[in-house]
Regions:
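Mature-chain termini and adjacent capping regions
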Residues: 1-164
Length: 164
C-alpha cells in the first residue's frame, strides 16, 4: 500500500470516527436548560444583605435558587436591580455554580443570568453533562427562552460511539 493511498485511508477513517464528535459539538441540544418566567422563584441561603447604594442584594452560603425544574446552586448570588428600581437586571453567581434542569447539568466557577434576554453565561472550567455525554470548555452561553447555546474555549467532549 503506497503512502498516498494509506494517507487517504487514514484521513477517511479519522473523518468517519470523528463525525459523532462534530455532531455533538455542533448540535448540542440545550432544550432541557429552559426557564419559564411565569413560574415563582424560590431562594434559600444562609444569609441575605441589601445594599441600597449599589441597588443590589446578595445571598450568601449554600445558595439555592429554583424556578420550575431549573435549579441554580452557588456559594454566593448577587442580584442587581434595574436602574429604575423595578425588576431585576441580572443575577451573578460565584463559588461552585451548578445549573441543573432535567437531565442537563452545567457547572462552572461563575455564572451571569441576564433577565431581559434570558441568557446565562457560565465561565471558568465549564462542564456540561447531558445524560451520558459530557462537554467542557471555558465559556458556556445558553439562551433559556429557546434552548440554544454554544460552548467555547478549548472544547473537549466525551461520547459513546453509536449513542446520543
Amino acid at each position: 500500500m503506497g503512502f498516498p493511498r494509506m494517507f487517504r485511508l487514514a484521513a477517511l477513517l479519522a473523518l468517519v470516527l470523528a463525525t459523532p464528535i462534530f455532531a455533538q459539538q455542533g448540535n448540542i441540544d440545550f432544550g432541557g436548560l429552559r426557564a419559564d418566567p411565569k413560574l415563582p422563584v424560590e431562594v434559600t441561603a444562609d444569609s441575605f444583605a441589601v445594599d441600597q447604594a449599589t441597588n443590589s442584594a446578595t445571598f450568601s452560603g449554600e445558595v439555592r435558587i429554583s424556578q420550575g425544574d431549573m435549579v441554580i446552586t452557588a456559594g454566593e448570588v448577587t442580584i442587581e436591580y434595574a436602574e429604575d428600581g423595578k425588576g431585576i437586571k441580572q443575577l451573578i453567581a460565584s463559588g461552585g455554580v451548578l445549573l441543573k434542569a432535567g437531565n442537563d447539568a452545567a457547572q462552572a466557577q461563575t455564572a451571569t443570568y441576564l433577565i431581559d434576554t434570558a441568557q446565562v453565561t457560565l465561565t471558568g472550567d465549564v462542564i456540561l453533562t447531558q445524560g451520558s455525554a459530557a462537554i467542557s470548555g471555558q465559556t458556556l452561553v445558553v439562551n433559556l427562552s429557546d434552548g440554544t447555546g454554544r460552548i467555547e474555549g478549548r472544547v473537549t467532549t466525551t461520547f459513546l460511539p453509536g449513542g446520543n
